[in-house]
């Protein structure tokens, strides 16, 4: 019977390629430090694709992103640290991320240079200034992505969304783009192995490099006009329901 895990050589090769990618990326992070938005977006896309390629991770876009202007608030379900690379590879933006990521190698610096807003999830006092900062970023025409679950899940369902940060889209009169992320193994079944909901980053990374094949599917589900929502709770509900429907679509074949 063949193993459902990658060989030790494959795991080692992936880790080596990731190390090389981290080293090269660390030397070229200035490419996403401010400057021309088009140049920054190209650099962010290249970083996202490079990280996934180093780990042999496939990326598929199901429902494509609709035509829309810049300055969009992007809301997605949160499964893994790979989410940021997958989304960056197909839809470059700034991110709202937990404070801890700021100290991560490369990813933290990449986030800082790309305009990521780092938040303390345990402090409600951060919400108002963060919404103000995100609103200003949206009004400048820059896209901002965030994970309204506020923490990672298994990826086979959704945790309840938080409404607070949707206020920035209402204040800016911006569109909100709903994105669903799903992870598949070598058999085409949904998998929770890339999730770091219950493990640390090193264990999660080892799980990922140990998989024979991993594919991330990105679906751009719908666009909501924040100005048409009664309040941030109604806006949150609309986005949450649309993402939940896609995430739950084939979760029954998960392994």
From Swiss-Prot:
GO terms for cellular component: plasma membrane. InterPro entries: AGP_acyltrans, Plipid/glycerol_acylTrfase. GO terms for molecular function: 1-acylglycerol-3-phosphate O-acyltransferase activity. SMART domains: PlsC. It is found in: Cell inner membrane. Its EC number is 2.3.1.51. Transmembrane segments: none annotated. The keyword Nucleotide-binding does not apply. Keywords: Acyltransferase, Cell inner membrane, Cell membrane, Lipid biosynthesis, Lipid metabolism, Membrane, Phospholipid biosynthesis, Phospholipid metabolism, Transferase. GO terms for biological process: CDP-diacylglycerol biosynthetic process; phosphatidic acid biosynthetic process. This is 1-acyl-sn-glycerol-3-phosphate acyltransferase. It comes from Neisseria gonorrhoeae. The gene is plsC.
């Amino acid at each position: 019977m063949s193993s459902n895990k990658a060989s030790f050589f494959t795991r080692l090769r992936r880790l080596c390629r990731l190390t090389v990618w981290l080293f090269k990326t660390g030397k070229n992070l200035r490419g996403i430090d401010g400057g021309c938005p088009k140049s920054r977006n190209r650099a962010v896309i290249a970083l996202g694709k490079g990280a996934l390629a180093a780990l042999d991770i496939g990326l598929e876009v199901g429902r494509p992103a609709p035509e829309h202007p810049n300055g969009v608030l992007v809301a997605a379900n949160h499964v893994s640290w790979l989410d940021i690379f997958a989304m960056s590879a197909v839809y470059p933006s700034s991110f709202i991320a937990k404070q801890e990521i700021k100290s991560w190698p490369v990813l933290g610096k990449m986030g800082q240079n790309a305009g990521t807003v780092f938040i303390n999830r345990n402090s409600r006092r951060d919400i108002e200034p963060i919404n103000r900062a995100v609103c200003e970023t949206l009004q400048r025409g820059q896209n901002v992505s965030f994970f309204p679950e506020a923490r990672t899940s298994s990826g086979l369902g959704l945790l309840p969304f938080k409404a607070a940060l949707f206020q920035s889209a209402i204040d800016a009169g911006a569109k909100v783009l709903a994105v669903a992320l799903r992870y598949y193994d070598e058999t085409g079944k949904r998998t929770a192995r890339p999730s770091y909901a219950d493990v640390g980053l090193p264990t999660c990374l080892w799980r990922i490099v140990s998989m024979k094949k991993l594919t991330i599917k990105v679906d751009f589900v719908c666009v909501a006009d924040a100005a048409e929502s009664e309040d941030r709770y109604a806006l949150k509900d609309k986005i949450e329901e649309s993402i939940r429907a896609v995430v739950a679509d084939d979760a029954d074949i998960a392994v």
